[in-house]
Amino acid sequence: MDIRIKEKPEEFYVKEIKKLDLKEKGQYAYFLLKKKDMTTLDAVRHISHRFGIPLKNIGFAGLKDKKAVTEQYISVKDLNEEKIRKMDGYRTENLELKFLGFSDKGLELGEIEGNYFEVVVRGVTKYHRRVFPRMKELVENYGCENYFGEQRFGSVKHAEEFIVKYLLRHEYEEAMKEYLTSLGDKRLKRLLRKAWRDWDRFLSLMPKGAKPELEVVKALRRGESFKNAFMVLPKNIRLMFVFAYQSYLWNRYLYTFVVRYLKYCKTPFLKWELAFFNDMSEVIWEEIKDLEIPYLGVEYKPRNKKAEIVMKEVLQDEGITPKMLMAERIGIKLFSDGVRKAFFKPQGLKVIEERKNSLKLSFTLPPGSYATILLRKLFCSDVKS
């Protein structure tokens, strides 16, 4: 019994929360960017192309959903007054800009206080209405598991294996085949796999919007090795391979922790499952409320013994050895350590509109937490969008 979101972009609204200290002069001009049915990167590329601004001069604090109406800030370095006038009030069908002021510092990724959401949830059944009040109370009193959401996994949902696993084994051709043929369109996936190593045929079949991937195949056609062809990809795309696998590992740590030590309900998530506590006592919460789980436990050691046991078991089950954690391939480290809070608490969680088969919710989340994860917990249900 899945709930549904994003049936229209207007049904998923996100506004970035950030205190701006702006003035009348400065090296960086700040704009409010409002967009609809468009990724942040596509919006920034459009602005760069339309106004002749180098991409590196445009800063933003986070990537916002595509199928949504979103508001976020961007900073643009070294703009003259004429260009600011042209950009202020600029609008297309999918985006609009509003000039706000200046600063001596540009925006960088992660520099926000949080995100405010208004979301219409459809497909609400009697089961969901029975579950929701109890889960809402648990979330308000305690919190929600801080799993990584779908956005961290890219095309993994259509892949057989994580690309990092192939790279660890130096299987560069298999890694490349997984990357270039993991598509939702099963027929196209089959045709691409059949055309493997016939690069002219392969190029003719590829989606035309896949620019970095097209360049990789052209490099293979020129005779580059599979290993070297990976280097044609921009570093941020290569790093996505790392983020996807590390997000999966971290989600597995938290899932195992919840299933082993707490009362829970499970929901489907891509090709896996997530578990959410559906009961809690003050005594247990006091023990786990500040729990932080490292990504690897190399530089950052787990301070919770139960989390440490779970991490060791998951890494062992995945066949990841301490030596592998130091591995470098295709110009990047395949693993990097850090810590992440196990739980987050949304602010201002409210039902702002109720209909027979739908609810409209509003809430504010801290940076790095996912609305789709919160919705899975609130309804103990998968989320389709």
Swiss-Prot record:
The keyword tRNA processing applies. InterPro entries: PsdUridine_synth_cat_dom_sf, PsdUridine_synth_TruD, PsdUridine_synth_TruD_CS, PsdUridine_synth_TruD_insert, TruD_catalytic. Gene3D superfamilies: TruD, catalytic domain. Keywords: Isomerase, tRNA processing. One of its GO terms (molecular function) is pseudouridine synthase activity. The keyword Isomerase applies. This is tRNA pseudouridine synthase D. The gene is truD.
